């Protein structure tokens, strides 16, 4: 977990008079810490030789940004908002791997953002009774097939809010990704649902307090919805809509995209039907279709393994490196390969081979999104 100084400095970097996220991310990923960037602000080109003049100048002249960062952190502490910088273990690892991931997120909730299985459900703000019934049946059936899934959406009208409410009703944790700061809620009609989500999931944003819900922010938040997830599910959409933007971003991140077909000629089925016809999404008609396509029948596999008494003491003989991986997974539950590499200090190429061997021995299981699970 990042300390307060690192959090403050990361917020500061987001407030600089500098508009290229790519340039800042390149520097941040190379250094690994906002604090180290600021400590080396007078010799940045020793670290990143091709850093632009504007980037260097913005970092060297950061006093105004520091004041705003201090105000933000004070507010966050007072109102129970958790700032999560990119170098914090709590940061969504799937999102971290994306080229345009935000440097910091702000969170209110209790759900683990790095769960084994994460999906997003998106679509039109004008959800029809057909769409509402699809969401209800899909989530209800999914709960029986795969009970531990984190469901993400945008807390907007229509498909978003129906998905959140059905997730809550079925005992799923659900995250709402917002297009503004956590000092407000848009739309306000969803306050009651949002309050329940904080107790059974959470609210997440990249935006500081006092940030309005401007139109461009909704497009920006869609990349977080897409980046955090293993799969994107489009329920209903007109020929053009925000849900289709999330589908496009999901494809660019290499995520699986699914869509429910609708009746020909229905306005809010046109986007889904077009996406399926153009091979932009896999057609599904049920939760069972989805689980099979994602190869998520592994809940039954894990249950059988436990019933057969596959305990760690009965594992095949392990090498010292294999045992180190097992020890890390036993303490931290599910992890992606990058985090396992960090915690074991084993380079990725070697680690990949070791993980494959452990899976062949029946010691671990791999899931969508590159998550590794220790079979206990």
Residue ranges and their predicted role:
Residues 2-4, 85-376:
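Glycine-biased, small-residue-rich flexible motifs in mid-sequence functional cores and linkers
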Residues 1-147:
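Short, positively charged patches
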């Amino acid at each position: 977990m990042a300390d307060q100084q690192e959090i403050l400095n990361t917020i500061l970097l987001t407030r600089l008079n500098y508009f290229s996220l790519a340039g800042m991310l390149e520097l941040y990923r190379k250094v690994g810490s906002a604090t180290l960037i600021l400590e080396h602000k007078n010799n940045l080109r020793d670290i990143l030789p091709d850093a632009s003049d504007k980037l260097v100048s913005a970092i060297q002249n950061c006093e105004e940004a520091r004041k705003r960062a201090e105000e933000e952190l004070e507010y966050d502490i007072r109102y129970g908002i958790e700032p999560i910088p990119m170098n914090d273990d709590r940061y969504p690892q799937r999102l971290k791997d994306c080229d345009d991931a935000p440097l910091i997120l702000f969170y209110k909730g209790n759900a683990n953002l790095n769960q084994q299985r994460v999906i997003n459900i998106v679509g039109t703000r004008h959800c029809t009774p057909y769409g509402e019934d699809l969401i209800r049946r899909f989530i209800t059936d999914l709960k029986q097939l795969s009970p531990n899934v984190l469901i993400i959406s945008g807390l907007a009208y229509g498909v978003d809010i129906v998905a959140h409410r059905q997730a809550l009703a079925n005992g799923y944790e659900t995250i709402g990704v917002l297009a503004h700061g956590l000092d407000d809620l848009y739309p306000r009609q969803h306050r009651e649902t949002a309050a329940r989500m904080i107790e059974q999931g959470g609210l997440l944003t990249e935006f500081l307090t006092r940030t309005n819900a401007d139109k461009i922010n909704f497009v920006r938040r869609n990349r977080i919805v897409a980046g955090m997830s293993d799969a994107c599910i489009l329920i209903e959409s007109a020929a053009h809509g925000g849900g289709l933007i999330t589908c496009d971003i999901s494809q660019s991140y290499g995520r699986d995209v699914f869509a429910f077909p609708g009746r020909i000629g229905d306005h809010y089925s046109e986007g889904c039907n077009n996406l399926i016809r153009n091979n932009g999404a896999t057609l599904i008609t049920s939760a069972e279709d989805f689980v099979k396509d994602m190869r998520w029948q592994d809940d039954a596999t894990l249950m059988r393994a436990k019933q057969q008494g596959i305990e760690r003491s009965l594992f095949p003989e392990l090498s010292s490196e294999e045992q180190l991986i097992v020890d890390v997974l036993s303490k931290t539950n599910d992890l992606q390969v990058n985090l396992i590499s960090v915690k074991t200090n084993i380079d990725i190429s070697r680690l990949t081979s070791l993980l494959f061997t452990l899976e062949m021995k029946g010691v671990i299981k791999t899931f969508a999104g590159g998550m590794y699970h220790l079979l206990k």
